[in-house]
C-alpha cells in the first residue's frame, strides 16, 4: 500500500524514474521514499532527518506500508552530512531556499549529481546558489498546494557555470517556457514581487539606475512570457 502524496511531493516523484538510490533529506514520515519504492521508481531509498522523532515516525510508516524491507534505510543526518552512500538523486523538500543552499554548500556534490529541490520560500536565493556553484537547472515545475504556488527544481552539478539571464534568478528558463496554469500563476507571483522591488528602487532617495533598468527588463520579460 502506497501513501497519497501532496502535490509538491508528487511533483518530485514524477521527476524520478529508473534510479538506483534516492536520498530524501528531511524525510519526516518517509512518504516520498515509501511511494518511490512502491512504484519501483528506484531500487533503494535513504530516508534522512536531523531528529530522532521524525526518523522514528518514518520507520513506523515504512513498516506499515511496506512491511519489513531493506530497500529503505533511515539515517540520522544534519542535511547531507551523514549520507555516505552514492545516490543517483538527492531530494530536499519543505524547507526554505536558503536552508537548502546551506545544506548543499556544507557538503559539495560531485559533477553529474542530480538534485530535486522544493523550496518553501526564498527560491530566488536557491537558484542564485545553484547558478553560482555550477548547477544546471534542467527542469523546473510550478505546483499549487493549499492555495499557494511553489516550484520544484531538478538540477545537475556540471563542470562549469552555465550562462543565465537576469530573470532566471526569479524563474529558470525551463519554467519560463511553460504555459500550463500553474506556470502562469507562478510567473504572475514573481512579476508582482519584481514590480514591488522595482517600485521601492524607484522611490529611493539615492536611485540605483542600473538596478532599476535591470528590474524593468525582468518585468518586461515576464509580461511577455505570461
Language model regions located:
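Active-site capping/gating segments
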Residues: 46, 50-53, 122-128, 132-165
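S-adenosyl-L-methionine
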Residues: 1-19, 34, 56-85
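Conserved beta-strand signature within the Rossmann-like core of class I S-adenosyl-L-methionine
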Residues: 111-123
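Glycine-rich SAM-binding Motif I of class I
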Residues: 30
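Conserved S-adenosyl-L-methionine
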Residues: 25-26, 38-44
Amino acid at each position: 500500500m502506497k501513501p497519497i502524496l501532496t502535490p509538491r511531493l508528487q511533483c518530485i516523484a514524477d521527476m524520478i524514474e529508473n534510479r538506483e538510490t534516492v536520498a530524501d533529506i528531511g524525510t519526516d514520515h518517509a512518504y516520498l521514499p515509501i511511494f518511490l519504492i512502491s512504484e519501483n521508481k528506484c531500487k533503494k531509498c535513504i530516508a534522512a532527518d536531523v531528529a530522532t522523532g521524525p526518523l522514528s515516525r518514518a520507520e513506523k510508516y515504512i513498516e506499515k506500508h511496506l512491511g519489513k524491507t531493506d530497500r529503505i534505510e533511515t539515517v540520522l543526518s544534519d542535511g547531507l552530512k551523514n549520507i555516505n552512500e552514492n545516490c543517483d538523486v538527492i531530494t530536499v523538500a519543505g524547507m526554505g531556499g536558503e536552508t537548502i543552499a546551506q545544506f548543499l554548500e556544507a557538503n559539495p556534490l560531485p559533477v553529474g549529481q542530480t538534485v530535486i529541490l522544493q523550496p518553501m520560500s526564498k527560491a530566488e536565493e536557491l537558484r542564485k546558489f545553484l547558478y553560482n556553484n555550477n548547477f544546471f537547472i534542467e527542469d523546473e515545475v510550478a505546483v499549487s498546494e493549499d492555495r499557494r504556488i511553489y516550484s520544484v527544481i531538478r538540477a545537475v552539478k556540471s563542470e562549469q557555470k552555465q550562462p543565465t539571464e537576469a530573470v532566471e534568478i526569479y524563474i529558470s528558463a525551463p519554467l519560463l517556457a511553460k504555459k500550463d496554469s500553474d506556470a502562469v500563476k507562478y510567473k504572475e507571483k514573481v512579476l508582482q514581487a519584481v514590480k514591488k522591488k522595482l517600485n521601492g528602487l524607484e522611490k529611493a532617495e539615492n536611485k540605483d539606475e542600473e538596478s532599476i533598468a535591470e528590474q524593468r527588463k525582468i518585468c518586461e520579460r515576464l509580461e511577455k512570457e505570461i
